[in-house]
Each structure stands twice: as structure tokens, then as C-alpha cells.
Amino acid sequence: MNATIDLDDAEALLAADLDGSLQAASMAGSQVRAVGTAIAEGALEPLRSEDRSRAVVWVSGRGTAATAGAILAGALSDTVSLPFVTATRAPVWVGPLDVMVIAGDDAGDPALSAAVTLGTRRGARVVIAAPDEGPLADSGAGRAISLAPRLRVPDTFSLAHHLAVGAAVLGVLDKSVAPDVMTIADEVDGEVSRNTVGREVFT
């Protein structure tokens, strides 16, 4: 006989959340806000240029980073004024007029490190949206912009961070789609508060 959990029983839900998924999910707004704080501190200032960018290239492996790239491409491809390209490795044509976002959760992924190395060598402006550690950090040290997650959550819950980085980068390059990342964080927090374990299911 399978055990059942009353979804209106907050204590039972929290007790059943052995891997901390509920807490990790509730941190989505905080992840977005952390990106907003980094931007306010000037993290993306090196992206600004008088020269028009040719393309934004989103390089990622599998997982939430790839999902974020697909969401951004689908949601903004008809809005932004420059191409948004998703890839699993740095394109051979990348150059000084391009912006590359290297997104992932594994700082030891050799494909991401190789993309950083190639992008910086060819003069592209490179943003790393991944943990600031290991080979990936070494490959971008002093040559790439780091927007590493300031809050660590399980990889399956890092989508909010990747989306916030992508939206922020696009906003710097195209003022017509510039998002208010802090407002987005507030909206996400509001959604989380409406879906906490302490609220009745059908409210």
C-alpha cells in the first residue's frame, strides 16, 4: 500500500522533502535577485560598446542551461535586434563583434572551457554563467565576465539564474528589451509565496 501525503499538511510535506527540493525551488527569486545585484555592481559594464554587436551566442551543454537558451531564443527571437544563437560549442565564425554566454552547472565541462578559450582568443566578449571554479574559471580568468551563481542550489533548480543572466545580457545589448531584473525577482518571489506549503491547495 502506497503512503499518501495531504497536500494541505505543511508539516507532512516538509518532512517528506528529504532532498530539500521545496527549499531549492523557493530560492528562484533569490537567484534572480543575485544576478540583479551583480549587474548593479557593474558586472556587465564591459559588455557595453559603441560598436553594434553582430550576434549573441549561447553556449551550453545539456540540462537547465540548455533549457534556458531555448526559452530565451523562443521568447525573444522576434523582439531583440540581433540574432540569438544557441550552440553546444563555440561556432567557428565567432569574432570581436559577437557576445558569447557560456552557461552551465559543471565547471569541469571541457566543452565549456574550450568555448571560453576560443571566444576570448578571437576577441568576443564572453560572459560565464557557471560556477566560478575549476578549469572553466581558469580559462576565463582576466578575460571573461563572470556571472557565477551567488546562491548554490541543485543543478535542476538553476534555471532561474541562467534565464536572469540571459535576459540581463540581452538588455545591455538591446535597450528595447532591457528587463528590470529586480522587478522580475519580486514577481518570482510573489509566485513562490502564492505556492508555499502553508497555503491551501485550491486558493
Predicted regions and their residues:
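N-terminal, Lys/Arg-enriched amphipathic/low-complexity engagement segments
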Residues: 14-49, 53-77
